[in-house]
Amino acid sequence: MSETLKLYFDYKSPFAYLAAEPAFALSERYAIEVRWIPFFLRIKGPSQRSQYSDWKAQYSYFDARRWANKRGGFAIKGPLKVYDSAPALIGGLYAQRAGFFRPYTEQVYARFFRRELEIDLPDQVAALISALGHSGDAYLAYARDEGPAALDACIEEAHADQIFGVPIFVFRGERFWGHDRMPLLEERLAEHGLARADTAASPAG
């Protein structure tokens, strides 16, 4: 029987983007179900940050691109503003309900970090959902009605799990922060006998 592995994510995080592809592959190698939980990452604007924070932000995107280059060089462009990712995160919850979460998530990350998608605009999220063959209007209705409360419930769960950033995996109460901690996570899954016998488990990278 599969165990549940929580993954807290935000579409505006380059490191959550780096974790996405290997996270989708985990269930192929381990007897787990990855439960993707949106988390609203609060980022200060330029006027609220210190010089040190600016340097850290610049380095973070440089480092994310360095990791992306090791995996074929997909685009990770820095954002032109601080984004309210709630419309896209609610879109993720809608996509989970409607059964197209993976293609939705892959497209949101890729388009956002190519600066081709404004994740704070519900109409653009709806257009993407329509392009994926699903109902953009149904998403907009969900975003007006049930979606905000569903996202709030995810944030409350994140607080209970002491989540402070993304990506964070939670396995049996143990947190693993960052895509570069995935090899440690995989070691823990293997220690608990969750590696699939028909698949050679290799560390994510």
Language-model features, listed with the residues they occupy:
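Structural alpha/beta surface segment adjacent to cysteine/selenocysteine redox centers
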Residues: 11, 15-112, 196-205
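C-terminal cap of thioredoxin/glutaredoxin-like
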Residues: 4-6, 10-32, 107-205
